[in-house]
């Protein structure tokens, strides 16, 4: 059985990768053509009035008329960055952008990274609660224990969208897959 070779990269290569062409790893692009004045008017004003009124009458229509159903917030405070520790919210941004890229590449799910500059559990919960209606799901990432468990549990109680705690659930999924594969051997 051939083992996969782990490739190593220099810090310079990694930094160059993050700055070539455009800084960072994600961008927002229109899902509709924006080539005419009519397109622009439909995309913004006055064209947004019809979906705005429809969603005001029935908030579930946000899943039909907006990106909400295919949009995940990847959220961290940078207090437990894998292999690096507590380096803070903004330092976690490359990791969260990387997670957003993985969502897009492997599941065609759009995601936005959000870094919350706080280690106060209640403040983090309230911050996420205040923006959650814009998203179809929340992915918590690199938040130190035990706060990560408290935050996840509380968000699951108060939000009506899925909350995925990547460090906990992702590890459980990988461990289960490894055990299943070990049984097959």
Summary of predicted features, one role per range:
Residues 164-173:
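Active-site nucleophile and cofactor-binding loops and adjacent substrate-binding regions
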Residues 1-161:
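N-terminal ligand-binding/catalytic initiation module
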Residues 172-185:
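Short internal alpha-helix immediately C-terminal to a glycine-rich phosphate-binding loop
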């Amino acid at each position: 059985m051939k083992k996969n070779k782990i490739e190593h990269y220099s810090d310079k290569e990694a930094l160059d990768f993050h700055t070539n062409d455009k800084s960072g790893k994600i961008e927002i692009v229109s899902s509709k053509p924006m080539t005419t004045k009519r397109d622009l008017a439909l995309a913004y004003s006055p064209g947004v009035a019809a979906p705005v009124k429809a969603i005001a009458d029935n908030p579930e229509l946000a899943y039909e008329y907006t990106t909400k159903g295919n949009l995940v917030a990847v959220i961290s405070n940078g207090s437990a960055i894998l292999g690096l520790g507590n380096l803070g919210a903004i330092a976690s941004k490359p990791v969260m952008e990387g997670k957003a890229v993985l969502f897009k590449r492997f599941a065609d799910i759009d995601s936005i990274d959000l870094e919350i500059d706080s280690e106060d559990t209640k403040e983090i919960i309230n911050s996420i609660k205040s923006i959650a209606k814009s998203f179809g799901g929340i992915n918590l990432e690199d938040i130190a224990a035990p706060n990560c468990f408290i935050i996840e549990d509380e968000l699951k109680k108060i939000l009506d969208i899925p909350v995925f705690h990547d460090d906990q659930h992702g590890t459980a999924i990988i461990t289960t897959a490894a055990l299943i594969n070990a049984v097959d051997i």
